[in-house]
Curated annotation (Swiss-Prot):
GO terms for cellular component: chloroplast thylakoid membrane; photosystem I
Subcellular location: Plastid, Chloroplast thylakoid membrane
Sorted UniProt keywords: Chloroplast, Membrane, Photosynthesis, Photosystem I, Plastid, Thylakoid, Transmembrane, Transmembrane helix
Source organism superkingdom: Eukaryota
Job of this protein: May help in the organization of the PsaL subunit.
Family, similarity comment: Belongs to the PsaI family.
GO biological process: photosynthesis
Membrane topology qualifier: Single-pass membrane protein
UniProt-listed Pfam families: PSI_8
Name this polypeptide is given: Photosystem I reaction center subunit VIII
Length: 37
């Protein structure tokens, strides 16, 4: 039960770091595919 209680404090920074990383990666792939640069 201790692990279950500590789950939100583990997932909040994980989501806060992983979601922007996925967003930036998909954005950079989208830019490379469209060849804006």
């Amino acid at each position: 039960m201790i692990i279950f209680n500590n789950l939100p404090s583990f997932f909040v920074p994980l989501v806060g770091l992983v979601f922007p990383a996925i967003a930036m990666a998909s954005l950079s792939l989208h830019v490379q595919k469209n060849k804006i640069f």
